[in-house]
A protein has these predicted regions:
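A structural preference for short, hydrophobic beta-strand core positions in alpha/beta folds
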Residues: 1, 173-175
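Short, well-ordered beta-to-alpha junction loops that form the rim of enzyme active sites
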Residues: 3-4, 10, 144, 178, ...
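Charged, often glycine-rich, active-site loop that binds/positions anionic groups
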Residues: 13-20, 186-199
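Glycine-rich, small-residue loops and helix-cap segments
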Residues: 48, 165-168, 173, 195, ...
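A short helix-breaking turn/cap at a secondary-structure junction
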Residues: 73-157, 162, 220-224
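Flexible, acidic loop-helix segments that line cofactor/substrate-binding pockets
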Residues: 118-125, 137-138, 142-145, 176-189, ...
C-alpha cells in the first residue's frame, strides 16, 4: 500500500504533504517526523509489520525515533532505488521501519542486491555477523554532538544513561572530536537543493506532473503548472538549488560544498578507524505539536 509523506520527501514533520499532515499515534496533535512520517506511524500503530520510506537526510531515522520504531538507512547503493522519485540522487536511499532489529535484518537481507535498473546499486555481497552478546565493541562518542547547544536536554540525559549502561557491560567508550559539525547542515542543503532543482525540472506540465488548465501557450504552461502544482516548501528548495547552480554562484556555493562533503567523509572514515560504532542522537529535538515551527530554517535544523 501507499503511505503519506512530505511532498517529494522534503520536510521534517510530514506537514508538507499534499494530502494533509500525519498525526503521531503516540501523542495527539503532535507530528511524527518526516519526511516518511506515514511509514513510521503505520508500523508504530500496528497497521503493518514493516514499511519502507526514503531517507535523504534523516527522513527514515528521524520519524522512527519520534514514533518508537527502528529506522534504518542502509549504505548508499545497498538497496535499489529503482522506482523512487528522486529528490537528491547522491543522497537518496530506501530505508526500513520495523518493530525490532531482527525484522530490520530480515528485510535488508531480502531487499539488498544488485539491480540492473539501478546503476548505483552495489555489487558487494551482504554479510551478517552472528549475534554475540558477549562481544565487546569500541563505541565512539562525538564530543561536539553531545555538547551542542541545539541538543534537547532530555535527549542528552537519556544518551548519557545509555553510555553508562554500555560501560557497565564492558564496552569501550572512545571520545572523539568532529570539528566540522557546523558545516553539516549548510553543506547538505546546498547539495540537496541543487540536485532537487535538476531532478524536479521534468515536472513542467508537459513531460510529467500537474498541468494547469488555465495555461495558454508553452511558456505559460511551464510557469503556471509549476507555480500551482508544487507546494511552498518544494518551491523554496527548487529556488535555492537553482540559485546555487546559477552562473556566478556555482563555484562559490556548489563546488565548495562538494569539497566540504569530501572533507566530512574523510573525517568520518578516520573515526571508524578507531571505533566499531558511532553513538549519536537521531535528531536534536523531540516531537513537537503541529504548526509549532513556522521558520523553515528551524525546521531544517531538525535534519
Amino acid at each position: 500500500g501507499r503511505l503519506n509523506c512530505d511532498e517529494f520527501a522534503m520536510g521534517s514533520s510530514n506537514e508538507n504533504s499534499a494530502f494533509g499532515p500525519v498525526e503521531n499515534n503516540l501523542k495527539k496533535n503532535y507530528v511524527p517526523g518526516g519526511s516518511s512520517g506515514g511509514s513510521a506511524v503505520a508500523v508504530s500503530a500496528g497497521l503493518c509489520t514493516v514499511s519502507l520510506g526514503s531517507d535523504t537526510g534523516g527522513s527514515v531515522r528521524q520519524p522512527a525515533s519520534w514514533t518508537g520504531t527502528y529506522g534504518m538507512k542502509p549504505t548508499y547503493g545497498r538497496i535499489s532505488r529503482y522506482g523512487l522519485i528522486a529528490y537528491a540522487s547522491s543522497f537518496d536511499q530506501i530505508g526500513t521501519f520495523t518493530n525490532c532489529v531482527e525484522d530490520a535484518q530480515l528485510l535488508l537481507s531480502i531487499m539488498a542486491g544488485t539491480d540492473e535498473f539501478d546503476a548505483t546499486s552495489s555489487t558487494k555481497e551482504l554479510k551478517f555477523e552472528d549475534a554475540d552478546s558477549s562481544k565487546k565493541y569500541r563505541i565512539g562518542i562525538i564530543k561536539e554532538c553531545f555538547d551542542h547547544s541545539g541538543l534537547d536536554e532530555e535527549i542528552r540525559s537519556h544518551l548519557q544513561k545509555i553510555i553508562q549502561d554500555l560501560k557497565l557491560k564492558g564496552h569501550e567508550i572512545i571520545d572523539l572530536s568532529f570539528p566540522f559539525i557546523e558545516y553539516l547542515v549548510p553543506t547538505y542543503y546546498v547539495l540537496t537543493t541543487a540536485e532537487a532543482s535538476s531532478n524536479l525540472s521534468r515536472f513542467d506540465g508537459v513531460h510529467f506532473g500537474y498541468r494547469s488548465p488555465e495555461a495558454k501557450g508553452v511558456e505559460e504552461t511551464y510557469i503556471k503548472s509549476r507555480t500551482e502544482g508544487f507546494g511552498m516548501e518544494v518551491k523554496r528548495r527548487i529556488m535555492a538549488g537553482t540559485f546555487v547552480l546559477s552562473q556566478g554562484y556555482y563555484d562559490a556555493y556548489y563546488s565548495q560544498a562538494q569539497k566540504v562533503r569530501r572533507v566530512l567523509k574523510n573525517q568520518t572514515d578516520k573515526m571508524f578507524e578507531k571505533t566499531d560504532i558511532l553513538l549519536m542522537p537521531s535528531t536534536p529535538g523531540t516531537a513537537f505539536e503541529k504548526n509549532a515551527i513556522k521558520d523553515p530554517i528551524q525546521m531544517y535544523l531538525q535534519d
